[in-house]
Design a protein with these regions (language model features):
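Acidic (Asp/Glu)-rich catalytic clusters
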Residues: 17-18, 42-54, 79-85, 107-112, ...
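Catalytic cores of alpha/beta
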Residues: 8-15, 65-77, 124-139, 163-167, ...
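Active-site beta->alpha loop and helix N-cap motifs at the rims of alpha/beta catalytic domains
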Residues: 10-12, 35, 42-102
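Active-site-proximal loop/turn and secondary-structure-junction residues that shape catalytic pockets
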Residues: 9, 30, 59-61, 95, ...
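Hydrophobic, well-structured mid-protein blocks that either form specific transmembrane helices
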Residues: 82-134, 139
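Glycine-rich phosphate-binding active-site loops on the catalytic face of alpha/beta enzymes
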Residues: 23-35, 80, 84-96, 141-154, ...
Length: 228
């Protein structure tokens, strides 16, 4: 069972590391769905914390339809993140009608190679998830981060289960959104996912969210006891 902790700052990443996490998705502005983190933060996570860092490449909040200026920025982000030694790139592209932008998705998997690409929760906004699954696979992505097209993974567990069955060994279904220590066993057992994604966040006295080491410890512990 692989666990990915979503971290929105260098301190959150350090907390996840201290709790035993090996892999993180790194972003900033988590409350807005996440945007691309600073290069310094990426560098610290890779070189000082020695984590497997999957970097979210998203230039702004909002929809997943980008203009050429934004796309060029994202391409440069990917190039720099590869130079910094990241373990994965996380992106997602849609057309206005909610279909997968396959041309852009393929363009970014080729640019990122040999670094693997995760297609993020833009997938949950697609209009036809079965068709979209096949398109994302054909574009060369290695993972799909999804809640089963529902607000949380538990609410989307029926779709997640079907996604796992349809995907087989062709792509990894990474279940995320609302994954907690108290529901991870039920989610994994029911859906058959082999990887889960959780933020394990709490609000600090400073009024911002941060990854909670105790929650990460509990999530890792409960996930480690799952038997198939």
């Amino acid at each position: 069972m692989e666990i990915e902790i979503c971290c929105g700052s260098i301190q959150s990443a350090a907390n996840a590391k201290a709790a035993g996490a090996k892999r993180i998705e790194l972003c900033q502005n988590l409350n807005e769905g996440g945007t691309t983190p600073s290069y310094a933060t990426v560098k610290q996570c890779v070189e000082e914390l020695h984590l497997d860092v999957f970097v979210l490449v998203r230039p702004r909040p909002g929809n997943f339809v980008y203009n050429e200026l934004e796309i060029r920025t994202m391409e440069e982000d990917v190039r720099i993140c590869k130079q910094l030694g990241v373990a994965g790139i996380v992106v997602g592209f849609l057309h206005e009608d909610g279909s997968i932008d396959t041309a852009l998705t393929r363009r970014f998997t080729e640019l990122a190679a040999p670094v693997p690409v995760t297609f993020h929760r833009a997938f949950d906004r697609c209009k036809d998830w079965k068709k979209s699954l096949e398109e994302v696979i054909a574009c060369g992505c290695k993972r799909i981060l999804t809640s089963g097209c529902q607000p949380t993974a538990m609410e989307g567990k029926e779709t997640l289960k079907e996604l796992v069955q349809l995907a087989g060994d062709r792509i990894t279904i990474l279940a995320g959104s609302g994954v907690r220590p108290d529901n991870v066993r039920e989610l994994v057992t029911y859906t058959g996912v082999r990887e889960v994604h959780g933020s394990c966040k709490v609000q600090t006295k400073g009024g911002y969210d941060e990854t909670c080491a105790e929650k990460v410890v509990a999530l890792l512990k409960n996930a480690s006891t799952i038997t198939r």
